[in-house]
Curated annotation (Swiss-Prot):
EC number, as in UniProt: 4.1.99.1
Disulfide pattern: none
Highest taxon in the source lineage: Bacteria
Any Pfam family matching the protein: Beta_elim_lyase
The protein, known as: Tryptophanase
Cofactors that this protein relies on: pyridoxal 5'-phosphate
Keywords attached to this entry: Lyase, Pyridoxal phosphate, Tryptophan catabolism
Catalytic activity: L-tryptophan + H2O = indole + pyruvate + NH4(+)
Oligomeric form and interacting partners: Homotetramer.
Encoding gene per record: tnaA
One MF term in the entry's GO annotations: tryptophanase activity
Species this protein is from: Salinibacter ruber (strain DSM 13855 / M31)
Pathway: Amino-acid degradation; L-tryptophan degradation via pyruvate pathway; indole and pyruvate from L-tryptophan: step 1/1
Length: 471
């Protein structure tokens, strides 16, 4: 059947506050044209991130009531640990309050000045945590990963030839190799098991550990089942286990593929690294059996890890994301292809060729989409990645607007509304203007930077979009 049916019933709802275009123009101006600065209740459809925005299941809510809040040795920790090891058989599982804390602890152990840490593509917090130690983050995605409309089943793969060349030339400077699954910066693109095995073989040759940044591990496994020869008859759970069998460690934000609102972990096989990690954890996060999380959160993660490998859920998840991508393509909106698992990525460089990269075309599109219909996405381009460690500015590899779809939150009609807003926006894309940054922090500037349009009338004179309602 053609209808995409959500494989769940809705038990609890939250009202959406509708706003007029005039209100949204005022609110985005007050937010200094940075969508991170908006109040969430002034957003109609929030596609800023899929991180921590999932709707939890009835079973997860029930799990909250079982949470044991003992400071040390909580049974909730041991249920959490068992759930992690059921999918990811690492020796040591160290909880953290979210993924970037796991990254910070790991980089504090392995990185430092003169180190290089390669990956297919590092996402923003990983890169920042690497650079905070004085190390260099190196991106080695395959060539197809740089071309938004290139059709490749595993565009998230790391370039094994370039990885081997780096390890051969500078292996003494490489403490770990990372793989981000799926590759968020590159469009939510998956990494094949063949590529994971190939990376592990190189790591073994040069005696370098392989660590997976595994926030969307289940989506990656589902893509493997659908696209990689020999895995069509394997269960997602089996594929997940095989993925992690080739790694020496992992960082994880539970706010993605553990279907919860907070949490993460660092998992390792190396005993010495684990001892150092737990010492750092006690210093900044908490005792090793809670790691900055309440026992109830550990319980919710344990349940979420069972639910995320349900193949009916994953089929719905991929189909709904694909539906949005295909509809935008029909409207003539260029997107990263094939459609990723957690988000649709708009190629703003192609859609708005009149706006130079350092005038931030994806940010321009993000602001216009919010003003048009109250939809919040996020720029993944030169605002996020253009600032270099020495303070200079260079265009990012791609200028993308990410529409990240929260798990189990929106229905098909919400997605149809997003499509309708794009239809209204595409007809006046030529009127959109570039932006400039007026205030920024030294790191991760996209979260708090202030911007302004180079032609304010392009933002504030258009007619109303699809929604015109008073709050």
């Amino acid at each position: 059947m053609d209808t995409i049916i959500e494989p769940f019933r809705i038990k609890s709802v939250e009202p959406i506050q509708l706003t007029s275009r005039a209100e949204r123009e005022r609110m985005i101006r007050d937010a200094h044209y940075n969508l991170f600065n908006l109040h969430a209740d002034d957003v109609i459809i929030d596609l800023l991130t899929d991180s921590g925005t999932s709707a939890m299941s009835a079973a997860q809510w029930a799990g909250l009531m079982q949470g044991d809040e003992s400071y040390a040795g909580s049974p909730s920790y041991f249920r959490f640990e068992e759930a992690v090891k059921d999918l990811m058989p690492f020796e040591h599982v160290i909880p953290t309050h979210q993924g970037r804390a796991a990254e910070r602890i790991l980089m504090g152990i392995v990185a430092g000045p003169d180190a290089k840490i390669p990956s297919n593509t590092h996402f923003d917090t990983t890169r920042a945590n690497i650079e905070a130690t004085g190390a260099e983050a190196v991106d080695l995605v395959i060539d197809a990963g740089h071309v938004p409309d290139a059709e490749h089943p595993f565009k998230g793969n790391i370039n094994l030839d370039r990885l081997e060349a780096l390890l051969d030339a500078e292996g003494d400077r490489v403490p770990i190799v990372m793989l981000t699954v799926t590759n968020n910066t590159g469009g939510g693109q998956p990494v094949s098991l063949a590529n994971i095995r190939g990376a592990k073989a190189l790591c073994d040759t040069y005696d370098v550990p392989l660590v997976l940044d595994a926030c969307r591990f289940a989506e990656n496994a589902y893509f493997i089942k659908q696209r990689e020869d020999g895995y069509g008859d394997r269960s997602v759970k089996e594929i997940v286990r095989e993925m992690f069998s080739h790694a020496d460690g992992m960082t994880m934000s539970a706010k993605k593929d553990a279907l919860v609102n907070i949490g993460g972990w660092l998992a390792l096989d190396d005993d010495a690294w684990a001892r150092k990690a737990r010492n750092q954890l006690i210093l900044t996060e908490g005792f090793p059996t809670y790691g900055g999380l309440a026992g109830r959160d550990l319980e919710a993660i344990a349940v979420g890890l069972q639910e995320i490998v349900d193949e009916d859920y994953l089929e719905y998840r991929m189909a709904s994301t694909r539906y949005l991508g295909e509809a935008l393509t029909e409207l003539g909106v260029p997107i990263v292809k094939p459609v990723g698992g957690h988000a649709v990525y708009i190629d703003a460089k192609s859609l708005l060729p009149h706006i130079p990269p350092l005038d931030y075309p994806a940010q321009s599109l993000a602001v216009a989409l919010y003003v048009t219909g109250g939809i919040r996405g996020v720029e993944i381009g030169s605002v996020m990645f253009g600032r270099q460690p020495d303070g200079s500015e260079e265009p990012a590899d791609q200028e993308l607007l990410r529409l990240a779809i929260p798990r189990r939150v929106y229905t098909q009609s919400h997605v149809d509304y997003v499509i309708e807003c794009f239809e209204a926006l595409v007809g006046r894309k030529g009127a959109l203007c570039g932006y400039e940054i007026t205030e920024e922090p030294p790191q991760l500037r996209h979260f708090t930077a202030h911007l302004r349009p180079k032609a304010p009338e392009a933002v504030h004179h258009e007619t109303d979009g699809p929604v015109e309602a008073s709050s």
